[in-house]
Design a protein with these regions (language model features):
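Non-catalytic accessory/interaction domains
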Residues: 1-120, 124-134, 165, 321
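Structural detector for internal amphipathic alpha-helices that build alpha-solenoid repeat scaffolds
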Residues: 30-34, 59-73, 97-113, 132-146, ...
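Amphipathic alpha-helical scaffolding segments comprising HEAT/armadillo-like alpha-solenoid repeats
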Residues: 38-48, 72-90, 112-126, 146-158, ...
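Short secondary-structure transition/capping segments
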Residues: 50, 230, 305-307
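Short inter-helical turns and helix N-cap capping residues of alpha-solenoid HEAT/ARM repeat scaffolds
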Residues: 53-54, 94-95, 129-130, 160-161, ...
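Short solvent-exposed coil/turn linkers within tandem alpha-helical repeat scaffolds
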Residues: 92-93, 191, 249-251, 269, ...
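Terminal, low-structured helical/coil segments at or just beyond the last alpha-helical repeat
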Residues: 293-324
Length: 324
């Protein structure tokens, strides 16, 4: 129903209806650029979630219902209604990205252990879906840390999607299964773009927490030649994933000699990219002895005020991190 807004402080509109609406889909798809305050009841949000044809309104309903479910004053009956509504959206024929958003929303309000309906829903999603939605279902099932699903995770390691493989590796590590170590180390050899398989292997080993995998992790750190993304993040760059895994196992000191030698070579080569990438890796170790790196940096760049500013910033962040 079109309306016109007059240039005045307050506009009032009246609509004649046969009964009060279950929800009002105000500002359909947010085509009107504005800020609004529009209070709705739990019933209205639930109805909006199930009946609206506006994907933005449905997403807003998910967000608001998550907040309601997380409110300690919300009754168990109301929370169960919200959970059921989310499950209906997840198993619908809707667009996969929206259904994934609904699944992530459900994960925010569910506590372990999951009931049979939720577990079956996740298992069915893993069988029938792919990529993002399948990975999200594996992530959620992985939170159970249940060894029963080891074979499901192992099968998912052969998926075409790196996202699914990564989720499966992490879930497998969480089970602490005696089979996980061998499976995860073998994953490193699976061909992948820029060694994504290695990153997934390391992520899984981090969750497994088995210190007998340290030798493998050290070999990954020593490998400075394999294809990789130079993005300085454990999500995309395997040396950073390896350092994170080693730190999680409480063995960070084993990587320091490797990285310090590499850092010294980068200083000799005057390769700024290598210098600061090595600094980032060394900083992740959170070791007191890493302070010597900053002494060498300040000596190397004592005549370059711009680089000294960058060094100062790195050092400040490092010193804060080792205080924790």
């Amino acid at each position: 129903m079109p309306i016109q807004i007059q240039p005045k402080k307050e506009n009032i509109y009246y609509f004649t209806l046969s009964k009060a609406p279950d929800f009002v889909n105000f500002n359909f798809e947010e085509n009107w650029i504005c800020e609004t305050v529009y209070l709705q009841s739990t019933h209205e949000y639930l109805y909006q979630l199930s009946q609206s044809h506006d994907i933005v309104a449905k997403q807003k309903a998910l967000d608001q219902l998550v907040a309601i479910a997380q409110d300690t004053s919300t009754s168990p009956m109301t929370k169960n209604k919200i959970i059921h509504a989310f499950q209906q959206e997840i198993t619908s024929n809707g667009y996969w990205r929206y259904r994934q958003y609904a699944l992530v929303s459900l994960r925010k309000i569910l506590t372990l252990p999951y009931d049979d309906y939720t577990t079956t829903m996740l298992l069915n999603l893993i069988i029938s879906e792919k990529s993002w939605l399948k990975a999200s279902a594996i992530n959620m099932l992985g939170n159970t840390k249940n060894e029963t699903y080891v074979d499901i995770y192992q099968k998912a390691l052969y998926d075409n999607s790196d996202r699914v493989i990564n989720a499966a590796a992490i879930a497998l590590g969480k089970t602490k299964s005696i089979k996980a170590k061998e499976i995860l180390i073998a994953l490193d050899k699976k061909p992948s773009w820029k060694n994504q398989s290695r990153i997934s292997s390391l992520n899984g080993l981090e969750q497994l927490g088995d210190t007998s995998t340290v030798d493998f992790i050290i070999e990954c750190i020593k490998d400075n030649q394999s294809p990789r993304w130079y993005l300085a993040t454990p999500v995309w760059d395997y040396p950073f994933a390896a350092i994170n895994t080693l730190v999680a196992l409480g063995k960070s000191e084993l990587a320091y000699p490797i990285l310090f030698d590499r850092f010294q070579k980068s200083l000799q080569d005057n390769d700024l990219n290598d210098i600061f990438q090595n600094v980032q890796l060394i900083d992740l170790l959170n070791l007191e002895q890493s302070k010597e790196v900053y002494v060498l940096l300040q000596q190397k760049f004592k005549n370059d005020p711009d680089i000294l500013k960058t060094i100062s910033m790195y050092e400040s962040n490092f010193l804060e991190s080792i205080k924790k």
